[in-house]
């Protein structure tokens, strides 16, 4: 590099380039890291220097040089690049490396209207000094490079027009804690703030995008999962559409139950007109979902639910594929098919499935969710009733069409409605589960609206977080983490605003939470067990037993302190039923691990005090949160040791945790021979989880004759999922070779559907 080059400082001054300054920063960034070379980063950087380059560009150049060196053999470059990026970020935010004192920072941000003014009203100067003492800014150096770029892109308060950053990560963590516990008694709240800050800033607990980016700002809307049920009237359809727009404008993910909409050709007003069927209204929903685009961000995302016995099912199943024309396709939303035991039995016995318009059989539609015995009885009666419009189709043909479309699009999902109601947190007679959410992990009661202000309707919301299994040293750790998660998320329900009254009614009366996990693949590798061979069964059983037990215990303690949720009597917990009472007993055939905790003691406590929250657990996808925590995604096996994601900031490489130590213990997705082991582990988890799991299936055509996945295999996995008691199936991933080059996932499928980040972590 020529030493007579000049640089332009951040304040506009020019001076000769000082190589020692750069060298000093690089030495600092590499301290304590393995297999990183300062000279190698300098070598890569020098080529790109030019006269009058700005110090900002120099910094960005050396960051990119370090990031480009991230590989399986040299994973610590992800931390070197991250430290350089943190240095740069703080310079942009504060004009210096050292962050300001917390009170000074909050005062300035409130004056700029970036932070909620209630922070200064709720806490004294002395309390800010105390919170400042809790902060460990060096924890910023624990982020990977991909995590820093996610923080910059999604979480940190900024001006999205000019790119100005206003804060760094530790202020985010301490102020989320301060906001959520602001209404706790003054004699205990600082203790909770300190504990919660430590848990989230050390990645033991992961929070979703709406909370991470929104709590501490004047905007108090943190919609996670939104479930909206649509009735069979124009008023209800329009109310559904209006509700979709309100929540999509907040970048929320939407689940829509459109199963009641009558079929094509059904009479309207006693035959005065005939119905146009489902497809025009699905298009209406699609337009609503895609209507809001903020600053060039793509519109929202939704999954539509309908029963497999709907009269239009053959036309609905193909709505997402690339064949057909625009008039008979609705490709920009996803679909979930609702199935129960009788439908599976018809397929296995080689029988027919009879299709109806739900409007002709309203009692059948109701029983489909609330009473399986009654459903079968009514279904058989309607099949014999010659006065009701119907159509029969061979069950195997219908299931094959469904699985064919699931394979070709990857995004035809499955909801087993009987499992959702028989192994549920809710009493199906009072609060049946009639749909799920965008990502198929939430199972909460809903009720259709007649207008957007309808106080009788119910829109379900669920508030999410996750435990990082990689940080669990003992199963007893779940006790403290459950106390903190349950209390913090419960506070959000009262802290946030609600754009639709029916959503507030549901959230406040049911207080449903969905707490899941990240880093399961690392957890298995660390414990030297695998997805595919059954060796992880007992560990998984013990882990998820402890998780659900301590979540319920924490909610029960909170109910003792603050009272049970007002609709606690709508839950199975109210009846004394726990998840261990209602799970699919086939699980006992594949896992003989006994229960280790005192469930009868817990049952008696719940009977005495109730629960503060109707539900506690759900296992969601966790793309973004996993990157922040440098963890593997949810319960999923990694596709490769290093993931490469192409973003607006360039290529982001992230290496699985402890790659060098555990590379022989990790089981990569495409090395797993089939879905059986993964599905069995999900079934063991579902034994304890009181909502559902975003369960994916994966197929490598190269493993099959003529590179074609046999329908027999697809149906086998579908039936196995049902046999294991799984409530829902999410993506079907088919290996096409495009990701084999260093496992590139240029825009992961989860990130693509869940752009809002609301229904995922």
Swiss-Prot record:
Keywords for the protein's UniProt record, in alphabetical order: Allosteric enzyme, ATP-binding, Deoxyribonucleotide synthesis, Disulfide bond, Nucleotide-binding, Oxidoreductase
Could you say how this protein's activity is regulated? Under complex allosteric control mediated by deoxynucleoside triphosphates and ATP binding to separate specificity and activation sites on the alpha subunit. The type of nucleotide bound at the specificity site determines substrate preference. It seems probable that ATP makes the enzyme reduce CDP and UDP, dGTP favors ADP reduction and dTTP favors GDP reduction. Stimulated by ATP and inhibited by dATP binding to the activity site.
EC number(s) in its UniProt entry? Answer: 1.17.4.1
- Pfam families hit by this protein: ATP-cone (PF03477), Ribonuc_red_lgC (PF02867), Ribonuc_red_lgN (PF00317)
Gene3D superfamilies (alphabetical): 1.10.1650.20, 3.20.70.20
Q: Enumerate the active-site residues.
A: 437, 439, 441
- Disulfide linkages recorded for this protein, renumbered to the chain, are 225-462
| Catalytic activity from the UniProt record | a 2'-deoxyribonucleoside 5'-diphosphate + [thioredoxin]-disulfide + H2O = a ribonucleoside 5'-diphosphate + [thioredoxin]-dithiol
This protein's GO CC annotations: ribonucleoside-diphosphate reductase complex
Record-listed ATP binding positions = 9, 15-21, 55, 91
Q: From the UniProt record, which GO molecular function terms apply? A: ATP binding; ribonucleoside-diphosphate reductase activity, thioredoxin disulfide as acceptor
Q: A GO term (biological process) for this protein?
A: deoxyribonucleotide biosynthetic process
Amino acids binding GDP? 209, 437, 441, 623-625
Site Important for hydrogen atom transfer: give positions: 225, 462
* Swiss-Prot/TrEMBL site (Interacts with thioredoxin/glutaredoxin) positions: 754, 759
Domain named ATP-cone: residues = 5-95
Site annotation (Important for electron transfer) points to 730-731
Is ATP-binding there in the keyword field? yes
Q: Does the keyword Chaperone feature in the UniProt annotation?
A: no
* Residue positions binding dTTP: 232-234, 262, 269
| Family to which this protein belongs | Belongs to the ribonucleoside diphosphate reductase large chain family.
Oligomer and partners: Tetramer of two alpha and two beta subunits.
Job description of the protein: Provides the precursors necessary for DNA synthesis. Catalyzes the biosynthesis of deoxyribonucleotides from the corresponding ribonucleotides.
Q: What is this protein called?
A: Ribonucleoside-diphosphate reductase subunit alpha
């Amino acid at each position: 590099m020529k030493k007579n080059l000049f640089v332009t400082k951040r304040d506009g001054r020019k001076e000769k380039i000082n190589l020692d300054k750069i060298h000093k920063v690089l030495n600092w960034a590499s301290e304590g890291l393995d297999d990183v070379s300062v000279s190698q980063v300098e070598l890569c950087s020098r080529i790109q220097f030019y006269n009058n380059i700005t110090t900002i560009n120099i910094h960005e150049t050396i960051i990119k040089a370090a990031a480009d060196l991230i590989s399986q053999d040299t994973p610590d470059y992800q931390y070197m690049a991250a430290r350089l990026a943190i240095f740069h970020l703080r310079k942009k935010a504060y004009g210096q490396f050292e962050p300001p004192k917390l009170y000074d920072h909050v005062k300035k941000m409130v004056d700029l209207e970036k932070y909620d003014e209630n922070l200064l009203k709720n806490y004294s100067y002395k309390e800010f000094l105390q919170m400042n003492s809790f902060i460990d800014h060096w924890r910023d150096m624990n982020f990977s490079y991909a995590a820093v770029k996610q923080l910059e892109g999604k979480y940190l308060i900024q001006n999205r027009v000019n790119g100005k950053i206003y804060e760094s990560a530790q202020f985010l963590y301490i102020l989320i804690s301060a906001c959520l516990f602001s209404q706790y008694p003054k004699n205990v709240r600082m203790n909770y703030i300190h504990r919660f800050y430590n848990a989230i800033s050390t990645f033991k607990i992961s929070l979703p995008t709406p909370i991470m980016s929104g709590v501490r700002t004047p905007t108090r809307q943190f919609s996670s999962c939104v479930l909206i049920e649509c009735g069979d009237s124009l008023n209800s359809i329009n109310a559904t559409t209006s509700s979709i727009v309100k929540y999509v404008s907040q970048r929320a993910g939407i689940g829509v139950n459109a199963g009641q909409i009558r079929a094509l050709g059904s009479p309207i007003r006693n035959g005065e007109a005939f119905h146009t069927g489902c497809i025009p209204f699905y298009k209406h929903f699609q337009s609503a979902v895609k209507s809001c685009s903020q600053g060039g961000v793509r519109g929202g995302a939704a999954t539509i639910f309908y029963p497999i016995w709907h009269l239009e099912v053959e036309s609905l199943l193909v709505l997402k594929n690339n064949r057909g024309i625009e008039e008979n396709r609705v490709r920009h939303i996803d679909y979930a098919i609702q199935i129960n035991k009788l439908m599976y039995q018809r397929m296995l016995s080689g029988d027919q499935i009879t299709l109806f318009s739900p409007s002709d059989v309203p009692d059948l539609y109701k029983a489909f969710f609330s009473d399986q015995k009654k459903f079968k009885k009514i279904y058989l009666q309607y099949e014999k009733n010659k006065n009701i419009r119907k159509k029969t189709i061979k069950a195997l043909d219908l299931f094959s069409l469904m699985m064919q479309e699931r394979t070709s699009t990857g995004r035809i999902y499955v909801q087993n409605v009987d499992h959702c109601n028989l192994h549920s947190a809710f009493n199906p007679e009072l609060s049946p589960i009639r749909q799920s959410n965008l990502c198929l992990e939430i199972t909460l009661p809903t009720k259709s609206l007649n207008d957007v202000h309808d106080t009788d309707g119910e829109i379900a919301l669920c508030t999410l977080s996750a435990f990082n299994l990689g940080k669990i040293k003992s199963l007893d750790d779940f006790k403290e983490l459950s106390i903190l998660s349950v209390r913090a998320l419960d506070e959000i329900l009262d802290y946030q605003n609600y754009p639709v009254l029916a959503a507030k009614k549901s959230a406040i009366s049911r207080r449903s939470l969905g707490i899941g996990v990240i880093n399961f693949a690392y957890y298995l590798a660390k414990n030297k067990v695998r997805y595919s061979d059954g060796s992880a069964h007992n560990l998984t059983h013990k882990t998820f037993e402890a998780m659900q037990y301590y979540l319920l215990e924490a909610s029960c303690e909170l109910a003792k302190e603050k009272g049970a949720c007002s609709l606690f009597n709508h839950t199975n917990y109210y009846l004394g039923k726990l998840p261990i009472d209602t799970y699919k007993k086939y699980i006992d055939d594949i896992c003989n691990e006994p229960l280790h905790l005192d469930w009868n003691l817990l049952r008696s406590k719940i009977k005495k005090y109730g629960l503060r929250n109707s539900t506690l657990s759900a296992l969601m996808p966790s793309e973004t949160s996993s990157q922040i925590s440098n963890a593997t995604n949810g319960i999923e096996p990694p596709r490769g040791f290093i993931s490469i994601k192409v973003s607006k900031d360039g290529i982001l490489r992230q290496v699985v945790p402890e790659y060098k130590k555990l590379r022989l213990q990790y089981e990569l997705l495409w090395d797993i021979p089939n879905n059986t082991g993964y599905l069995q582990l999900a079934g063991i988890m579902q034994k304890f989880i009181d909502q559902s799991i975003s369960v994916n299936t994966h197929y490598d055509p190269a493993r099959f004759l003529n590179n074609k996945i046999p329908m027999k295999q697809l149906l086998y996995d579908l039936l196995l999922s049902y046999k294991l008691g799984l409530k829902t199936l999410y993506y079907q991933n088919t290996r096409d070779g495009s990701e084999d080059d260093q496992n590139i996932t240029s825009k992961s499928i989860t990130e693509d559907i869940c752009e809002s980040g609301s229904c995922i972590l």
